[in-house]
Amino acid sequence: YISIIDVVLKLLIVYLLSLTSYDRLIFYAFLLLIVQVLIRITYGIYCKRHFIETAYRFVWDKMLFKEMANFATWQLFGNLAAVSYTQGVNILLNMFFGPAVNAARAIAVQVQSAIQQFTANFQQALNPQITKNYAINDLKRMHTLIFASARYSFFLLFFLSLPVLLETEIILSLWLKEVPEHTVNFIRIILVISMIDVMSNPLITAAGATGRIKVYQITVGGVLLLILPFSYGMLKMGGIPEFVFLVHLFFVCVAQVVRLGLIRSMISLSLRKFFKEVVVRAFMVTCLSSIIPLLSFLLLEQTLSTFFLICVLSVLSVSITVFFVGLLPNERQLVLLKINQWIKLKKS
């Protein structure tokens, strides 16, 4: 319900913007701040009423303050690194190509955010369990949850992304009257980046659970900051805007490898098992489920009816491939059990 209230309030903000004669950007920022404060207060009230362990009291624990400050400092470093390369890319694109290309990137990021929201909600349910199992020293269960979260998140994101990757042009033509140049390529590359990046989220949660994030944040943040100088170098040598996204893709892959190496030593994670259960299955699902939709996209004339056909084929192809290739044997049995229970319930 709180999420619904959040969305309704933001919709109300859009309506109020059409009524005001004041500077709309400042007014929008002010209203957005009020909404965030109200939502935060609402969450606080809810937790206080429903969880007995949620209570405020004044304490003085010097060691606890030191630990929290240390954790917050290095967490802030990682967040600043992410903001720096994200906004830095915007500045570079504006410097070399002007606002039109920045507009294309903004559209691509908007598509990315809409699709990623589905996986973010799913991962939000598993993250506390990952942290809890580290706290009780059940590393085996923690590893299982990390593998499952990375795998399922990839499948869910790919399920939503495949039709968008294939039918980017027609989706944009239905959405926008004028599509900025480079938007199609930007969306396709940024969705590939998202599919690699989504597998890192449970690893980030695992690193945070240990509390020992100094080396992790410096190393991974440092790798991601390299996006800026390399992108600048590419553009300075006459590269096209897409090169910035390809540089981003490369360093996201490097960061993932570095991240796995660091997590391995932090929680004794098996890289072989991660590669076998997550990477290999994700790769096989991607390759096998793309065949029929891709052939249809290449062979059929691009019309609105073809668009709907490819969407249906993508959904069916990914669903079937995930079931037979992506899931582990015990997971397939669980799915079949749930389906049988649902059928029996409907019959009764």
Residues of each region from the PLM?
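Hydrophobic alpha-helical transmembrane segments
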Residues: I2-R49, F71, G221-L226, I240-L262, ...
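Alpha-helical transmembrane segments of multi-pass membrane transport and lipid-handling proteins
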Residues: Y15-L16, I41-T42, H143-V198, L225-K236, ...
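Helix-loop junctions and terminal segments of transmembrane helices
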Residues: F51-E53, A108, Q112-A150, L157, ...
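Membrane-proximal transmembrane or re-entrant/amphipathic helices at the cytosolic face
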Residues: R264-F275, P293-S348
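Alpha-helical transmembrane segments of polytopic membrane transporters and translocases
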Residues: L31, L38, T73-W74, V89-I91, ...
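Interhelical loop/hinge segments that connect adjacent transmembrane helices in multipass membrane
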Residues: L25-L32, Y43-T86, A125, Q129, ...
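Membrane-interface junctions at transmembrane-helix termini in multi-pass inner-membrane proteins
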Residues: Y1-I2, I26, C47, L191-V223, ...
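Interfacial/gating helices of multi-pass transporter permease domains
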Residues: L25-F30, M63-A72, I91-S113, R141-T144, ...
